[in-house]
């Protein structure tokens, strides 16, 4: 019996025409990294039997509202979960900084997306214990941070993952490491599998 209850919507980072979305030396491009990770994820998820869609597959930026409309318009009987993949930055892309780590954003308030993001957060932290994980509250009780980012505000559950800082030299090296990128994909898959099981047991019955 197919217990794939999720429709995964992959949302790549900003297009190649958005300025500042790269490392200060220009050797790392967020739009390329994100699209490559999304392609790997889509292939693995398809093999596992998931329904997979993209908000955009082009290199240029379609606009945040168009991304949201694309996700809103996907017809499915499954529970829609949008995952937006980005790299973080402490500046505008012109200088190196020391800020580091991982953040996950969801829409404001207590929602089902918070539960899903906490599950993903826990999986990533388990698989990458040496990384700094940034909490949404000073007491570390809230894993995700709240934001009214356009892509988080549709008719679906959603999380935006800021994976490492593209203006931190050490983390840029990690973003270029194929082994680390593959491990990141595998960790995301495990997180999605856990979320899917939760949806199957609690939301689809």
What are these regions (language model features)?
Residues 15-17, 58-62, 87-93, 109-112, ...:
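Solvent-exposed loop/turn segments at secondary-structure junctions
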Residues 112-141:
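Active-site-adjacent substrate-binding region
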């Amino acid at each position: 019996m197919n217990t794939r209850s999720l429709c995964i919507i992959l949302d790549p980072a900003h297009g190649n025409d958005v300025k500042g979305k790269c490392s200060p030396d220009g050797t790392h491009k967020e739009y390329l990294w994100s699209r490559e990770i999304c392609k790997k994820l889509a292939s693995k998820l398809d093999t596992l039997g998931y329904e997979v869609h993209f908000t955009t597959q082009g290199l240029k930026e379609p606009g945040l509202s168009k991304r949201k409309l694309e996700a809103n318009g996907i017809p499915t009987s499954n529970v829609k979960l949008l995952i937006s993949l980005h790299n973080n930055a402490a500046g505008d892309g012109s200088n190196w900084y020391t800020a580091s780590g991982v953040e996950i954003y969801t829409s404001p308030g207590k929602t089902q997306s918070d539960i899903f993001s906490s599950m993903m957060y826990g999986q990533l932290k388990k698989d990458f214990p040496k990384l700094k994980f940034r909490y949404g509250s000073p007491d570390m009780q809230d894993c995700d941070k709240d934001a009214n980012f356009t892509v988080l505000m549709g008719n679906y559950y959603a999380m935006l993952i800021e994976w490492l800082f593209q203006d931190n030299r050490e983390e840029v090296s990690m973003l270029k490491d194929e082994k680390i990128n593959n491990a990141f994909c595998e960790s995301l898959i495990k997180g999605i599998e856990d979320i899917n099981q939760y949806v199957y047991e609690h939301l689809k019955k």
